[in-house]
Amino acid sequence: MKNVLSIQSHVVFGHAGNGASEFPMRRLGVNVWPLNTVQFSNHTQYGHWEGSAIDASQMLALVEGIGAIGMLPRCDAVLSGYLGTPEQAQAVIEIVRAVKAANPHALYFCDPVMGTATGYRVEPGIQEFLVRTMPEVSDVMCPNHSELQRLVGREIETVEEAVAACRELMKRGPKMVLVKHLLDRNSLADRFNMLVVTGREAWMGQRPLYPFARQPVGVGDMTSAVFVARTLLGDSVRSAFEHTLAAVNAVVRATWDAGRYELEIVAAQDDIARPRDWFDAWVVDPA
């Protein structure tokens, strides 16, 4: 069984960070080692929350503990998401290096959580670290549209510009870029776009965009997690991408149908493993 060290936020109530990632990966047959960067009562979009960030030294100590019992060689991938402090970002790099020293075949998937144009933000210093340093150590990066713009330092309005931006980012280190949400000025307003780019291919896919009054939090976290799991399970890039699109759609649709704000991950678990609705991806740049 594949093992993922998932370094993300934790909420006591609801689904965000590891709370949106652990269950989908496990439901797909991947073992998860959750390492929480923060412990909050709930996600921050409620406007009020309690809790705090975990000290970076404690994160390092926990991973050192795993190494001390000889388990780090079993780690097949590291997935990082929301970081609470710049020191945690540096700790993630040290953790990735430790994992790769123990298992040279391990992959690092970086979800560079910086927030959205209109939504949440991260603490000062984290965005700069993610932009400056993380591409150099990442095997795969999973930004949303606004995060991709920050990573390359310019606005992106079309699919072609997004593909070019991903390829530019890949020159700094990543072998693949998954754009979890792509805003394309030429797309229909009721479509949610995703894009995945490698050195040899680029695939685009769409699912319905559900008109929530308040968009659920954790969709991006779940998207990265499903893609990590399907990749580790041996899917091709296209297959992992399409399964991710379909599984996430199933959860979001169940959330919409239930009239909920928090993701209906448990209710939609069978569709995470075996989605009923499938969305075919298409080549947008054969490279």
From Swiss-Prot:
InterPro entries: PM/HMP-P_kinase-1, PyrdxlKinase, Pyridoxal_kinase_PdxY, Ribokinase-like. Homodimer. The lineage of its organism: Bacteria, Pseudomonadati, Pseudomonadota, Betaproteobacteria, Burkholderiales. ATP binds at D111, E147, K180. Keywords: ATP-binding, Kinase, Magnesium, Nucleotide-binding, Transferase. The keyword Magnesium applies. Substrate binds at S9, T44, Q45, D221. Its cofactor is Mg(2+). GO terms for biological process: pyridoxal 5'-phosphate salvage. Pyridoxal kinase involved in the salvage pathway of pyridoxal 5'-phosphate (PLP). Catalyzes the phosphorylation of pyridoxal to PLP. The gene is pdxY. GO terms for cellular component: cytosol. Gene3D superfamilies: 3.40.1190.20. Its EC number is 2.7.1.35. It holds the Pfam family Phos_pyr_kin. Belongs to the pyridoxine kinase family. PdxY subfamily. The keyword Magnesium applies. This is Pyridoxal kinase PdxY. GO terms for molecular function: ATP binding; magnesium ion binding; pyridoxal kinase activity. Pathway: Cofactor metabolism; pyridoxal 5'-phosphate salvage; pyridoxal 5'-phosphate from pyridoxal: step 1/1. It catalyses: pyridoxal + ATP = pyridoxal 5'-phosphate + ADP + H(+). It is an enzyme of class 2 (transferase).
